[in-house]
């Protein structure tokens, strides 16, 4: 959940 454009396995963040 670090980058808004990468679907992080721990926290998918799409801002």
UniProtKB/Swiss-Prot annotation:
LCN-type CS-alpha/beta domain location: 2-15
GO molecular function, one term: toxin activity
Xref: InterPro entries: LCN-type_CS_alpha_beta_dom
PTM comment, free text: Contains 4 disulfide bonds.
PROSITE patterns, per the entry: LCN_CSAB
Main location, first listed in the record: secreted
Record localization: Secreted
Secreted in keyword set: yes
Reported tissue expression: Expressed by the venom gland.
GO cellular-component term (any): extracellular region
Keywords for the protein's UniProt record, in alphabetical order: Disulfide bond, Ion channel impairing toxin, Neurotoxin, Secreted, Toxin, Voltage-gated sodium channel impairing toxin
Function: Inhibits tetrodotoxin-sensitive voltage-gated sodium channels (TTX-S Nav) in rat dorsal root ganglion (DRG) neurons in a concentration- and voltage-dependent manner. Lowers the activation threshold and produces negative shifting of TTX-S sodium current activation curve. Induces shifting of the steady-state inactivation curve to the left, delays the recovery of TTX-S I(Na) from inactivation.
Family label: Belongs to the long (4 C-C) scorpion toxin superfamily. Sodium channel inhibitor family.
Domain notes: Has the structural arrangement of an alpha-helix connected to antiparallel beta-sheets by disulfide bonds (CS-alpha/beta).
Protein name: Toxin BmKNJX11
Native source species: Olivierus martensii (Manchurian scorpion)
């Amino acid at each position: 959940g670090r980058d808004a454009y990468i679907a992080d396995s721990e926290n998918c963040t799409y801002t």
